[in-house]
Amino acid sequence: ASRGLGDVYKRQDKDIIKSTITSTDDGNGNYTNPVIFADVPDIDIIRVDDAFYMVSTTMHLSPGCPVMKSYDLVNWEIVNYVFDTLEDRDNLALRNGENNYGKGQWATTLRYNNGVYYAGFTSFSTGRTYIYHTDDIGNGKWDRFVYDECFHDMSLLFDDDGKVYLIYGGGQIWCIELEKDLSAVKPGTKRKLINDAGLVKGCLAEGSHVYKLNGYYYIFIITWPPHGRRTQLCYRSKALDGKWEMKVIIDDNMGFRNDGAAQGGIVDDKDGNWYCFVFQDHGAVGRTPVLSTMTWEDGWLVVGVDGKVPKTAKIPFAGHEKKSVVTSDEFINSQIVRSYHSFADTPEEAGESDYNGSNLGLEWQWNHNPDNRLWSLTERKGYLRLRTGDVCGTVANARNTLTQRTFGPECGA
């Protein structure tokens, strides 16, 4: 039988025991890939002191761009979101027959520099690029800079000389320089770094993640060859405008159909060990993250053993509490008011985006921007109250539809 949230949550003294259903911590010091058995695509990851932070794509959902935290790279929990409402437009709010499916927030780059966290992404729904920043990633408040142009699958680079770059593109990999405070793009700084990236494998590449390590610039990038599988490549050069070498980093389906594990970030620990976090398509569950160690060979970071991602491995830092990105299906009005903020520029109707005193758990997301006048956790304690708004023809067009991630290997409502 399929497993639903009701099967794994039990009430004791009116408290909810948090589930660990998306954790693959085996309880014996090992973990099993996928390391999070739930939809967490387009991941980027950083470490600050002993804590690891990760962001992911949530497209049309609201709030958007979840911030996840872990101390062992295996047990992750959602601690915040980057934004509540990206903007107030008809396509972002399921208004007037418009929608944002398959668009919205994509492939966020996450970086930490001089005490500030940065989360940046392009949205083809608005034709804009957003650079959010905060000094408290777990609680916000996030502020942002907005550029009125798109930089596909971009990656932030804080260089050793204090310059700041965006590396981006599909096939043609470009570079632009930003102002040092990231408030704007420096005019006249656009230049091409790599021509026809990934074409040697039969398909142009995208999904850049850029790093400066040991005197080299490394760009990790993904390609998807015809009749092949998603493959992780790495380009390196001693200068941004220099000659770029290429190496295949991962070409592995991990025994699951022909779905290759690729696209994501790398991170080190305090002892100098390196890890990669990429994702693999897992059907209806979505895009599930996989974790592998990395080792240096001839100036390249090599994944796992002979370029293969392990099915099971030791937890890098054992002994931490199990955590999950799916934690409850209860409608408890949280006492914690998260301080990610709405940037709705021109609300269609007063009150639609206003705070209504209800705080859903971080595992919940709305399908598109909600109408906050039409839902409540305060009118009846422990329950979600939904009120009808507009009449629509299909559930896909219904506002205030509440969602959670599916999880594997089985789940049900």
Predicted regions and their residues:
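Single conserved hydrophobic/aromatic residue that forms the stacking wall/gate
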Residues: 1-9
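Beta-propeller domains
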Residues: 13, 20, 27, 55-85
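Secreted extracellular polysaccharide-interacting domains
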Residues: 385-412
